[in-house]
Amino acid sequence: MIKLSYDVKKYRSDIAELVKDDNTVIELGCHVGRTTRTLPETCNIIAIDNSPEASKEMEKLSYVNFINEDVRLHDTLLKVFKITQSCDMLLIDLGGGYHPDTVFKVFYIWSSTFKPTHTIIRNRGLLEFFNSAEGKCEKYVSHEGFLESYHDSGIPPQIKEFSLWTDSLEK
């Protein structure tokens, strides 16, 4: 399932509704951990953020594997891939309402790589696009947390147009 919201309370409510105590959760854009703190401590949590203020706050959460890097970079994806090759939940909150193009690219690549059961995205631009678009006559629907019709085509190196990604991603 893929859920989209902008309101942070709705985003966290969607997470609480779907998360299970034993889930592997990859959180992209954890900032200082306000959403991370709402997750059960029994989850396997990998949280990533490149903001300077994130490190100090995330160090307080000993049960979280925090990575202070940019989620747009291949090296960051590779680092997480070495920790886990799949996840139950992919959480994406990169700036809340800005850069829907970047958020979608990050979603596409990370979800194609880790094949989450659920993806929850917080982004105003994507939500506005979704709420404004029509396309009901074509039946492309994913029941998982990734775009099922694309299967593995979002995994580097298969995305040739993204120069940030390399072909060194191997199991």
Where are these regions (language model features)?
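S-adenosyl-L-methionine
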Residues: M1-D21
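Conserved class I S-adenosyl-L-methionine
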Residues: D22-H31
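Glycine-rich SAM-binding Motif I of class I
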Residues: G33-R37
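Conserved SAM/SAH-binding beta-strand->alpha-helix loop
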Residues: S51-P52
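Conserved SAM-binding loop
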Residues: M58-E59
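Conserved SAM-binding strand-loop segment of SAM-dependent methyltransferases
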Residues: Y63-L73
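Short amphipathic alpha-helix with an adjacent loop that forms part of the alpha/beta core around
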Residues: H74-Q85
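C-terminal substrate-binding/active-site "lid" region of AdoMet-derived donor-dependent transferases
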Residues: G96-K171
